[in-house]
Amino acid sequence: MMQAAWQEISGGLTAPRGFQAAGITAGLKASGQPDLALIVSESDAIAAAVFTTSQVRAACVDFSRQQLDGNSIARAILCNSGQANAATGDQGWSDAVESAEQLAQALQIPSHQVLVASTGVIGQRIKMEALRTGIPQAIAALSPEGGPAAAQAILTTDLVAKQIALELPLGDRTVRIGGIAKGSGMIHPNMATMLSFITCDAAVSPQLWQEMLSRAVDRSFNQITVDGDTSTNDCVFALANGQSRTPAITERGPIADQLEAMLTAVCQHLAKAIARDGEGATCLIEVQVKGTADDAAARAIARTIAGSSLVKSAIFGRDPNWGRIAAAAGRAGVQFNSENLGVRLGEFELLRNGQPLPFDRNAASQYLRDRAAGAYLQDDTVLIQVDVGAGTGQGVAWGCDLSYDYVRINAEYTT
């Protein structure tokens, strides 16, 4: 990624100009926690999206994909939290359609300009009575400062809300990108429930905006794993409404590259926040791989290591077991010469040219304990570096350790 010319600003999702958001309690969750999020652009916005590749998809996924088929404009995103509306048959589809139509009518916009998302328990339909009464309440709560409330309303088993906003100078004006995300379990996206909604006030051509988002997702959300399970509801929506009044970006070039780099930075921040918030996790794991023939191969190895249950368990046990890292690298489906393999854990070099090195095991274990006790998303990252040869490919993936609490949380999820 190019050198950052942007800076982080407050406001999250609604930091970009021309966006409002709300997060309310509509009664969809039995807990009484916020459960309905609404994001609205004051003007037509170019919409891009990436969806789950699961063959079992929620109604909201197929419906929103259909909404964007041949249409690149969206004005609103509605997300309910509590029921996934997946594996709910024809009635689930009808509920998704009605959700969009109800919102469009209330906002007085075309229904094809509404995208919908759901998260919660698979097999449960949306509580439509609560949704019908919640939509006007959410509209009434819309605010240019509503980003944090929307970030809270999309959560399920998450422990913390996930949001960010960045600002980039372009000439005598600035462009902003904001985003929110949710995800804690069932996280192994390929585009958990993993949802992310991104706003931008740049003017970008539809094809270029979609290409930017797809590449950003490949380098962020598609590089995280908590438990290896891909959700039925995964989606990323990105709206760009042009309200920054900067010149339209219609083709690749230095300005487009800067915007894409900032979009990728937003996605990577949110992706890492999801991985760190993995159910029962005590630390974030970052796996850096280099030396492959290309970047895709490096990303594949990194993701395999980050997703290895044995690696994750070793990190939770504060065990610097490099053998598990090497084994995971070897089964990633990427060819390399094991005699070139090198592994580092933090500052400790464990393996060089395929041969183990002496290291202070107690100090390495203490490094893992210190990361588990570190400040959230600051000093809590376990760094694993893997070198497989002389190639120029590089890749990064993120995950978390696997604790007893992960099993407890998921064993008791619906009981």
Swiss-Prot record:
<dbReference type="InterPro" id="IPR016117">
    <property type="entry name" value="ArgJ-like_dom_sf"/>
</dbReference>
<dbReference type="GO" id="GO:0006592">
    <property type="term" value="P:ornithine biosynthetic process"/>
</dbReference>
<dbReference type="Pfam" id="PF01960">
    <property type="entry name" value="ArgJ"/>
</dbReference>
<keyword id="KW-0808">Transferase</keyword>
<comment type="function">
    <text>Catalyzes two activities which are involved in the cyclic version of arginine biosynthesis: the synthesis of N-acetylglutamate from glutamate and acetyl-CoA as the acetyl donor, and of ornithine by transacetylation between N(2)-acetylornithine and glutamate.</text>
</comment>
<feature type="binding site">
    <location>
        <position position="410"/>
    </location>
    <ligand>
        <name>substrate</name>
    </ligand>
</feature>
<feature type="binding site">
    <location>
        <position position="193"/>
    </location>
    <ligand>
        <name>substrate</name>
    </ligand>
</feature>
<keyword id="KW-0012">Acyltransferase</keyword>
<comment type="similarity">
    <text>Belongs to the ArgJ family.</text>
</comment>
<comment type="pathway">
    <text>Amino-acid biosynthesis; L-arginine biosynthesis; N(2)-acetyl-L-ornithine from L-glutamate: step 1/4.</text>
</comment>
<feature type="binding site">
    <location>
        <position position="182"/>
    </location>
    <ligand>
        <name>substrate</name>
    </ligand>
</feature>
<dbReference type="InterPro" id="IPR042195">
    <property type="entry name" value="ArgJ_beta_C"/>
</dbReference>
<keyword id="KW-0028">Amino-acid biosynthesis</keyword>
<feature type="binding site">
    <location>
        <position position="156"/>
    </location>
    <ligand>
        <name>substrate</name>
    </ligand>
</feature>
<comment type="pathway">
    <text>Amino-acid biosynthesis; L-arginine biosynthesis; L-ornithine and N-acetyl-L-glutamate from L-glutamate and N(2)-acetyl-L-ornithine (cyclic): step 1/1.</text>
</comment>
<dbReference type="GO" id="GO:0004042">
    <property type="term" value="F:L-glutamate N-acetyltransferase activity"/>
</dbReference>
<dbReference type="InterPro" id="IPR002813">
    <property type="entry name" value="Arg_biosynth_ArgJ"/>
</dbReference>
<feature type="binding site">
    <location>
        <position position="279"/>
    </location>
    <ligand>
        <name>substrate</name>
    </ligand>
</feature>
<feature type="site" description="Involved in the stabilization of negative charge on the oxyanion by the formation of the oxyanion hole">
    <location>
        <position position="119"/>
    </location>
</feature>
<keyword id="KW-0511">Multifunctional enzyme</keyword>
<feature type="binding site">
    <location>
        <position position="415"/>
    </location>
    <ligand>
        <name>substrate</name>
    </ligand>
</feature>
<comment type="subunit">
    <text>Heterotetramer of two alpha and two beta chains.</text>
</comment>
<feature type="site" description="Involved in the stabilization of negative charge on the oxyanion by the formation of the oxyanion hole">
    <location>
        <position position="120"/>
    </location>
</feature>
<dbReference type="GO" id="GO:0005737">
    <property type="term" value="C:cytoplasm"/>
</dbReference>
<feature type="site" description="Cleavage; by autolysis">
    <location>
        <begin position="192"/>
        <end position="193"/>
    </location>
</feature>
<keyword id="KW-0963">Cytoplasm</keyword>
<feature type="active site" description="Nucleophile">
    <location>
        <position position="193"/>
    </location>
</feature>
<keyword id="KW-0055">Arginine biosynthesis</keyword>
<keyword id="KW-0068">Autocatalytic cleavage</keyword>
<protein>
    <recommendedName>
        <fullName>Arginine biosynthesis bifunctional protein ArgJ</fullName>
        <ecNumber>2.3.1.35</ecNumber>
        <ecNumber>2.3.1.1</ecNumber>
    </recommendedName>
</protein>
<dbReference type="GO" id="GO:0004358">
    <property type="term" value="F:glutamate N-acetyltransferase activity"/>
</dbReference>
<dbReference type="GO" id="GO:0006526">
    <property type="term" value="P:L-arginine biosynthetic process"/>
</dbReference>
